[in-house]
Each structure stands twice: as structure tokens, then as C-alpha cells.
A protein has these predicted regions:
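C-terminal regulatory/effector modules of DNA-binding transcriptional regulators
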Residues: 5, 170-172, 178-329
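A detector for short, charged/polar N-terminal pre-domain segments
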Residues: 12-29
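Short Gly/charged-rich anion-binding patches and loops
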Residues: 29-30, 43, 76, 220, ...
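Generic structural marker for isolated residues within well-ordered, non-membrane alpha-helices
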Residues: 31, 45, 273
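Short alpha-helical "recognition helix" segments of helix-turn-helix
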Residues: 34
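Long amphipathic alpha-helical segments
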Residues: 37, 41-195
Length: 329
């Protein structure tokens, strides 16, 4: 991360400086680095500054925002709570200790304790930077469980546990990234063992809208659909709505599946879904999944909201039944 030292002082004394300028040599972290460290967009950070009075960055001599390390730690904690469905306005004024306590409660409620030995082993390997051993452990787990149970019973709780450890400061950013990459490899390797889907299989286009950077959720959905005989086409993350439309037509998609984390702006998601629905043929189904969908309080015409990851499997089976497709296709 790029750290700005705040060494540049205005030529006047501190008494004549504007309050917004840095008046001490303590380090500050620029907004781009904070965005990378926390996963919170620059726009969102500015909105919170106006709406909640937090964070309250200092300014360097050039007027650029500089965030303190303690603010970044708190922002990271809030982001992790947002990822499990907590609204930022409810926690933004709580202390870091209180945020950590709440995260611990949510981790327990979310079932991270269901595999305590596995969580302990995985965290130990991540901290030891033993990527090879971690990859082997995950591969063995996939073989023992099967892909769909692995996603629902292992990937989900492990991801929560690693996220909580990162939020508490027990893992560094690069260590969480190492875990995520290892999980990507395990899932992609398992998905690739399934045979090529025959002609007539449901074609599922998968992506996220701009500003949604979470890719693991897409891969988890693909891992649930592949054993059901779906032909999945992933565009990765952050695809503009118009490009989603073009890709759906080009790939002859039967279903467009979009993933939204809890932190994604609700209004932006709804507008994008409604725009996409209006410009795709009626026979192309649109699925919206992820934590954000729990906050949608009204029906979106022509859009299926799937807030529970496990609900992806029956959704595909229902789609097949309505179209008279054979169960394995």
C-alpha cells in the first residue's frame, strides 16, 4: 500500500494552518490505498464522511485525504460486518473492540464453529505461508465431500472464519489473498473435472456489475451448477450492464446470474437489474444472488432473487422443469 508520510508542512505556523491540514508528522494513508486495503470504494468513503462524520481524514498540503491507521482498521472491520449483512449506519460509531466482538458473534452464528479443527488447520497454513500444503488440504476435502457439499459445508464457513481473522488483524491482507487464491484453484480444478456439457444444456452467464469485486461468490455458484449439468460462462467481475446484455446475446445465455455482496449500493443494483431486464429477451432468466438481495424489500419483475447460496440448486432444477429439460441437462 502507498503510504504518505505527511511530512510536507505549510510554511506557516500550525496556528495559522487550516484545521483540515496535517499538523503533525504522523503518517497518513491515501484514499487509493485505503480502497485497496478495505475493499470500500472511494465514492463510498466520501459518502460516509458526509453522512456519518466517519472517517475524518486529515488533508495533506495538496488537499488530498490522509487516513490514520486506526481509521483504516475500523473501516476494515465495518466492511467485514457489511459482508455478513450488517448495515454500516448501525455500527459506524461503535469502537473497534465493539466491532470485533460483534464479528465474533456473527462468526459463531454463521456456523464457522461447525468445522473448528479444519478452520484451525487452514488458518495455521495461511499464517505459515504454506500454499502447497493448503492446496493439498483443500483438494483432499473436495474429494472426500464432493463438490456441492464442499462449497456449502466447507468453503462458506472457512471464508467467514478467514474474513473474521483478517478483520481482527490476525491475518494480513496478503495472507487473506493467498487463502482466496488457493480456494479459487481448488474450486476451478474440481469444476474442470466435469465432462463437457452436451448441446441443449442450460447456458448460464455469470458476472458482477461495476464496483462489485467479489469473485469467489461467482465461483462458488459455478461449482454448485456444474454438477447439475449447466454450461457456465464466467465474465469475471465488474461488467457494465450493456456489456452483460451483449454477452448474454452472444453466448445465447438461458440465464444471467449476477452476484452482489452486502456492501454493494442497493439502488445501483436495482437500477442495473431493471435496466438489464428491460433490454434482454423475456425468455432469458435473470438471477440475482448474494447478501445484498436480503435487503431488497420489493419484487423485481422478471428477476429471481436468490439470497441463500444453497438455493441456486433448486432454482436451476425449477428452471429445467419449467422448460421440460431432462434432470441431468
Amino acid at each position: 500500500s502507498r503510504i504518505r508520510s505527511g511530512e510536507c508542512q505549510a510554511p506557516h505556523s500550525s496556528a495559522t494552518m487550516k484545521p483540515s491540514l496535517v499538523s503533525s508528522p504522523s503518517p497518513g494513508i491515501n484514499i487509493g490505498a485505503v480502497e485497496r486495503e478495505t475493499g470500500l470504494s472511494k465514492d463510498l468513503l466520501r459518502v460516509w464522511e458526509r453522512r456519518y462524520g466517519f472517517p475524518r481524514p486529515a488533508r495533506d498540503a495538496g488537499g488530498e485525504r490522509l487516513y490514520s491507521p486506526s481509521e483504516v482498521s475500523k473501516l476494515r472491520a465495518i466492511k467485514r460486518l457489511m459482508d455478513v449483512g450488517i448495515r454500516p449506519g448501525k455500527v459506524v460509531h461503535q469502537s473497534l473492540d465493539a466491532l470485533h466482538a460483534l464479528a465474533g458473534e456473527r462468526a459463531s452464528d454463521g456456523g464457522a464453529g461447525a468445522v473448528p479443527e479444519l478452520v484451525r488447520d487452514v488458518l495455521a497454513l495461511v499464517r505459515a505461508h504454506d500454499a502447497s500444503a493448503l492446496q493439498h488440504l483443500l483438494a483432499q476435502r473436495v474429494m472426500r465431500q464432493g463438490l456441492q457439499p464442499f462449497v456449502l459445508e466447507t468453503v462458506a464457513p472457512l471464508t467467514r472464519a478467514v474474513g473474521t481473522a483478517w478483520m481482527r488483524g490476525d491475518l494480513q491482507v496478503f495472507e487473506e489473498h493467498q487463502f482466496t487464491e488457493s480456494m479459487h484453484v481448488a474450486l476451478r480444478t474440481a469444476i474442470n473435472t466435469f465432462p463437457r456439457t452436451p448441446e441443449g444444456s442450460p447456458r448460464v452467464l455469470m458476472t458482477t456489475f461495476p464496483r462489485e469485486t467479489h469473485h469467489l461468490g461467482l465461483l462458488m455458484v459455478e461449482a454448485l451448477l456444474a454438477p447439475e449439468g449447466a454450461h457456465c460462462i464466467s465474465l469475471g467481475t465488474q461488467t457494465p450492464v450493456e456489456d452483460v446484455r451483449r454477452a448474454a446475446l452472444a453466448h445465447r445465455a438461458d440465464i444471467v446470474a449476477l452476484s452482489f455482496s452486502a456492501a454493494y449500493p442497493l439502488r445501483v443494483a436495482i437500477d442495473g437489474l431493471e435496466t438489464l431486464r428491460a433490454h434482454l429477451p423475456a425468455q432469458v432468466a435473470i438471477w440475482a444472488g448474494g447478501e445484498l438481495t436480503r435487503r431488497v424489500r420489493r419484487t423485481l419483475a422478471g428477476v429471481a432473487l436468490i439470497s441463500d447460496l444453497a438455493g441456486t440448486i433448486p432454482a436451476l432444477r425449477d428452471w429445467k422443469a419449467r422448460r421440460g429439460a431432462p434432470p441431468g441437462r
